[in-house]
Amino acid sequence: MQRAALFGGGDAQMAAGDLGELLVPYMPTIRVPKSGDRVYKTECAFSYDSPDSEGGLYVCMNTFLGFGREHIERHYRKTGQCVYLHLKRHVIEKVPGASGGALPKRRNAKLFLDLEANGDLSSDDFEYEDEAKLVIFPDHYEISLPNIEELPALVTIASDALLSAKSPYRKQDPDSWEEELQASKHAKSLVQLDNGVRIPPSGWKCSKCDLRENLWLNLTDGSVLCGKWFFDGSGGNGHAMEHYKETGYPLAVKLGTITPDGADVYSFDEEEPVLDPHIAKHLAHFGIDMLQMQVAENGLRDNDIKPRVSEWEVIQEAGVKLKPMYGPGYTGMKNLGNSCYLNAVMQAIFSIPEFQRAYVGNLPRIFDYSPLDPTQDFNTQMAKLGHGLLSGQYSKPPMKSELIEQVMKEEHKPQQNGISPQMFKAFISKDHTEFSSNRQQDAQEFFLHLINLVERNPVGSENPSDVFRFLVEERTQCCQSRKVRYTERVDYIMQLPVAMEAATNKDELIAYELKRREAEAARRAPPELVRAKIPFSACLQAFSEPTNVEDFWSSALQAKSAGVKTSRFASFPQYLVVQIKKFTFGLDWIPKKLDVSIDMPDFLDISHLRAMGLQPGEEELPDIAPPIIIPEDPKDRMMNNFVESLDIDESSVMQLAEMGFPLEACRKAVYYTGNLGAEVAFNWIIAHMEEPDFAEPLVVPVFGGAASSGVAGLGAVGLDNQPPEEMVSIIISMGFQRSLAIQALKATNNNLERALEWIFSHPELEEEDGEPALNVMDLENHTNANILAEARSEGPRIKDGPGRYELFGFISHMGTSTMSGHYVCHLKKEGRWVIYNDLRVCASERPPKDLGYIYFYHRIPS
C-alpha cells in the first residue's frame, strides 16, 4: 500500500476492499451531522484559512470543526481524531473557444462549496472547481470523493451531509423562535383624546405615585402610570391597571421600550401583550414621532444621505486618491452587514502593544491550551483575530503582472485580501440581543462590551484592559448643608459633553438655519451645510463643571435635597479613551446627532483634572442610608419582604435600558453596584443575565432588627451580617482579595460604596492580606479565580501616571444616529495616518480629526 504525499495530491490507488478495510478502525469516530450541529466548512477555527487558501481546509468528521494546513496537526494531537474531509477550491483559467474568446458560460457542476467568488478575478477568464477528499491521519492517506461504490455507507452519508450542511452563522429555528404576538382588536378603532398631552423623552414618573420605573403610557389619554405584574414580570403599585378599570382605556405602551422597530404594548382588556399595527400613529398623537425614526433596508435613513453628504465625503476622504496599504498591521476587515462598528473598534484595539502582546504574543500558548471547541473560547478568537490583522498574511498586494505571465490553464493562486470576522462576531455577541443582530450599533457600547469580556477572560499575568482603567473621584455636595461625600469608581472612558453654547460661528449657524427652513418650505435643495465649531477647551470645561443630582437624599438632612456632583481623575490611565457625547434625543423623541467640529488636540494635558480629595474646611456627609419604605400594596409573591426605596441613579438605569436590557434588571445592576455608574452596572448585567430572576423586580429582604431600625445599608443583611456574594464578587473583580472584600463589607454594614472607601482608607490591611486569602475562595467564585490569583494587594489594577497624552487614533461616525450610518477608523502608524474603512486600508491624506466620535490617546512618558 503506497503512502500519499503529505498535504499533496498523491493519493494511493487501492481496491474497494482495501478502502473499506482502511476505514474500519475509524468508523466509531465518524458522525453524521444532526440538526443543531455547527459545521465549520468555510473557515479555520484558529486562522482565516478557507477552502480558497493554498492548503485548503480540513473538516473533522467528528467535531465538524475546520482547520487550515498550519493547525490541523494541533487538533489531531489534542483529540486523536484521524478522519478529515479536505475541501479545496481551485481557480482555473478558462480554455478559449475557436474564435479566440472564452467558451460560453454554463452551469459548473464542479461547484459545491458555499463560498464567495474572488472579486479580483474576471469570471470571463477564470472559473472555479471544488474538490473534496477524505484524509486519514497520521499517514495522510487520501481518498477522492465521490466514491460511493468503494466507501462504506456511513462515510458516504456523513460526507454528503457535511457538504450540504448550512452555515453555522445562520440562526437556527429553535434559537430564533419567539412567541408570535397577535394584533389587538382595539388597535384599529382606538379612540385618542385630544387633550394636548405631550410626552417628553425622559424624566417620567407615575402620575399617582413617585415610581420612576415600569411606567406605562395609556394610548387613549396619555396617562403615565406604574404597572403591576404584567407580562414581563415587572412590578409596581398597579396604577395603570386601576386606571383601566376606572376608564376602560384598553391599550398601554411601556416607556423605555420604544424603538424604530416598535414597542411593547399590553392590552388590559385582552389580558396579554399584543401588536399595535398603528403604534406609530398612536405615539405621534402624544408627540412621539416614530415615522421619522424608521430605518431603510440598507441601514441608512433617507435624511442620512442628503444633508450629510459632506460628512460622508470628509470622513471617508472621498475625492482624494488614496494609496492602498498592505502588510502586517494593514489588514482590512469585511463588513458582515452593519458590522463596521466592530471593525473600527477591533482595529483600534489591536494597534495597542499591550493587546498585541497579550493575544498575538501568547498565540502558541493560547492555541495549545484552547478547549476542544476553540470557536467558543474568547481568548482563542481574540488571538485569531489579532494574528489575522497583524501577521500580514491576509494583506498582500495584487500580483497582476504575474497573473498575465501565467501559463494557459495553469492554476491561479489568488491572494486573500482582508479577513471576515464572522466567527469572532458570532461568539462575542452570542449572549447579547443587539450585538448578535445585523443592526447598526454604538461603537462605544461595543467597546465596553469587549472590555467586559476581556476582564472576565484573563490571559497571562497581565490583563490588557488595565491600560484603559482609571479611578474617578466623585464629589457630591448637599447644597443646603454644604457637606460633601467623596467616592471613587472605576471607569474606562472619558465622556466629554459637547458645549454647543460655546460655538465660535453662531452667526453663520443662525443664517444657515434660516436658509434651511426657507428651502424646506419652498421644497428647494438645502443650502451648503454649516457645521458648529466648538473649542475643545469649552468641552473640557463643561466636563469639569458641577452637575445637578436628581432626587438627591442628603444624609445630613435625612431628607431629599438639591445636590451637585463634580468628577475628577483619581488616577490617569495609560491609554485615555475619549467619547464625544454627540448623540441625544430631541423633544420629539427623534434620536439626533450633534453635527459639530471640535478642534481635538494632537497633544492633550489634563493634569489639572487630578483629584485632590477632602479639602481643609470641608465636612463630610454622615454615613446614613435612606430609610426603608413599605410599599402600598405588599400582597404579592414577595409579601414577606420589604422593598427599600433607595437613591438609585436613574440616569445610569436609563442608559442601560437604552441598550435593550430589561428595566428591572438595570435597576438591580445599578443598586447592587452601589451607584458606581453605568459601566460598572453593565458588568453586573453581563455576569447575571443568564439567571432566571434576571428581569424580576428589585426586592431587598430585611431581617429582624434591621427592619425596625428604619435604616439599612446598601444591600440589607441577615442576622449574621454575611455579605452578599454578588457584592463580594464585584469587589474581587476590581482586583482586591476575597478576605479583604468580606472584611470591608462587614465593616460598612454591606454598603458597597462605603466598603470601597474603607478599603482605600486601610492600606495597611491590603499589605497584610496576601496569598492565604486564596485558600478561602469558594468554588462558586471559580470565574474570578484567575483574576484574584494575579491581583496584587494595592487595589484596583490601574496604571497611574502623568496626565499628558498624544493622539494615535480615532473612530468616526457618519449618519444621524447610532442605529444607522457607518463607522471608519483612523490610526497613526509608523509616523503617518492610515484610514481603515472595512476592507479598504489606505494612507490617509486628510484625517478628519475634528469629526471623530471616539478618540484614543496614549500617555507621553515623563
UniProtKB/Swiss-Prot annotation:
Regulation of protein activity: Specifically inhibited by spautin-1 (specific and potent autophagy inhibitor-1), a derivative of MBCQ that binds to USP13 and inhibits deubiquitinase activity.
Residue span(s) of domain USP: 331-860
Gene Ontology CC annotations of this record: cytosol; nucleus
GO molecular function: BAT3 complex binding; cysteine-type deubiquitinase activity; cysteine-type endopeptidase activity; K48-linked deubiquitinase activity; proteasome binding; protein-folding chaperone binding; ubiquitin binding; ubiquitin protein ligase binding
Residues at which Zn(2+) binds: C206, C209, C226, H239
Zinc fingers (UBP-type), renumbered ranges: 182-290
Ranges for domain UBA: 647-688, 722-762
Active site: C340, H822
EC assignment: 3.4.19.12
InterPro entries: Papain-like_cys_pep_sf, Peptidase_C19_UCH, Ub_carboxyl-term_hydrolase, UBA, UBA-like_sf, Ubiquitinyl_hydrolase, UBP13_Znf-UBP_var, USP_CS
Disulfide pattern: none
Catalysed reaction equations from the record: Thiol-dependent hydrolysis of ester, thioester, amide, peptide and isopeptide bonds formed by the C-terminal Gly of ubiquitin (a 76-residue protein attached to proteins as an intracellular targeting signal)
Keywords associated with the record: Autophagy, Hydrolase, Metal-binding, Protease, Repeat, Thiol protease, Ubl conjugation pathway, Zinc, Zinc-finger
GO biological process, one term: protein K29-linked deubiquitination
Job description of the protein: Deubiquitinase that mediates deubiquitination of target proteins and is involved in various processes such as autophagy and endoplasmic reticulum-associated degradation (ERAD).
Family in the record: Belongs to the peptidase C19 family.
Domains: entry comment: The UBP-type zinc finger has lost its ability to bind ubiquitin and USP13 is not activated by unanchored ubiquitin. The UBA domains mediate binding to ubiquitin.
Name this polypeptide is given: Ubiquitin carboxyl-terminal hydrolase 13
